[in-house]
């Protein structure tokens, strides 16, 4: 019974079903027609069903045969997928890589480009992408929810087992709607004026380590939103104030949706790190690390988001 489900048997059966002919299946597989016919007959005997109705000129799947064809095709696909995975693993290519991207560096365009180059380079690797805010990125890699973190914030944490290297920095701009009252206040704007308006904030997504607050004045109201795109839209509508990544502000300013203003004690650049598990030595991880070096492919993809020192 077990011999029925060999690769050779399943391939003979599915090929015969696709061509509707034992002779054409034999020609396709480089076998004799009698060998194909014998294999199918042995499978029918083992399964105790008729897989094909036969005529002098053609064969046709029975209802049981159609069901078995679907399952046999799935089994062959699984077999070939497993074989490809084993081959790649033996070459040091990870079967699966989980990437956590800091929301400051997450855009659909950049993430799609990242996946495009990774799948071109490593087509058999299963890639999962998630996004977190601030220390939520560290949380993901420390708790083994991610193998690689793109944009871990510049915070040194205890725990060990993590390698990291700088990939650039996010530069911040204080941005408000053109008709916001603060747009008409002399610069640099005093903190006493800033406190009068709510700060639109994206909450840190860390669960097991301390959450980080990006920028908030003492006594200032805060409005929490889930992501920086929502924060940007809220500030465009004049619902609050705050710092945004400069790349996001530049785009909004081209449409006259935001203006920038100078304030006392502006927010400093946020250094971004590429962090990996120390034990992650596979080819995908090493390739990503290499391509975030100067002139690397991934450095080029993220160059409009990150500032790098020359």
Curated annotation (Swiss-Prot):
Gene Ontology MF term list: DNA-binding transcription factor activity; transcription cis-regulatory region binding
Cleavable signal peptide: none
Pfam families noted in UniProt: HTH_1 (PF00126), LysR_substrate (PF03466)
Protein origin, superkingdom: Bacteria
Annotated InterPro entries: LysR_subst-bd, Tscrpt_reg_HTH_LysR, WH-like_DNA-bd_sf, WH_DNA-bd_sf
DNA-binding region extent: 22-42
Keyword terms, alphabetized: DNA-binding, Transcription, Transcription regulation
One Gene Ontology biological process: regulation of DNA-templated transcription
Family of this protein: Belongs to the LysR transcriptional regulatory family.
Protein name, UniProt field: Uncharacterized HTH-type transcriptional regulator YahB
Organism: Escherichia coli (strain K12)
């Amino acid at each position: 019974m077990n011999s029925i489900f060999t690769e050779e048997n399943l391939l003979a059966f599915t090929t015969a079903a696709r061509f509707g002919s034992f002779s054409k299946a034999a020609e396709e597989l480089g076998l004799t027609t009698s060998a194909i016919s014998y294999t199918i007959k042995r499978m029918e005997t083992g399964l105790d069903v008729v897989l094909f109705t036969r005529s002098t000129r053609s064969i046709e799947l029975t209802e049981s045969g159609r069901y078995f064809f679907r399952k046999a095709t799935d089994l062959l696909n699984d077999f070939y997928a497993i074989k490809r995975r084993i081959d790649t693993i033996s070459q040091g290519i990870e079967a699966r890589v989980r990437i956590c991207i800091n929301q400051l560096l997450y855009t659909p365009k950049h993430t799609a480009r990242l996946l495009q180059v990774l799948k071109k380079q490593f087509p058999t690797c299963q890639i999962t992408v998630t996004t977190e805010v601030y220390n939520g990125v560290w949380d993901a890699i420390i708790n083994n929810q991610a193998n690689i973190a793109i944009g871990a914030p510049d915070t040194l944490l205890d725990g060990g087992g993590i390698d990291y290297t700088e990939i650039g920095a996010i530069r911040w701009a204080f941005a408000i709607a053109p008709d916001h009252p603060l747009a008409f206040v002399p610069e640099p704007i005093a903190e006493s004026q800033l406190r009068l308006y709510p700060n639109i904030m994206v909450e840190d997504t860390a669960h097991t380590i301390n959450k980080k607050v990006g920028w908030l004045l003492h006594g200032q109201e805060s409005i929490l939103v889930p992501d920086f795109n929502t924060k940007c839209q809220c500030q465009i509508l004049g619902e609050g104030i705050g710092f945004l990544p400069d790349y996001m502000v530049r785009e909004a300013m081209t449409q006259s949706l935001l203006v920038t203003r100078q304030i006392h004690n502006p927010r400093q650049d946020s250094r971004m790190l590429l962090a990996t598990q120390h034990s992650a030595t596979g080819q995908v991880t090493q390739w990503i690390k290499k391509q975030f070096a100067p002139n690397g492919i991934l450095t080029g993809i993220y160059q409009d988001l990150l500032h790098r020192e020359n």
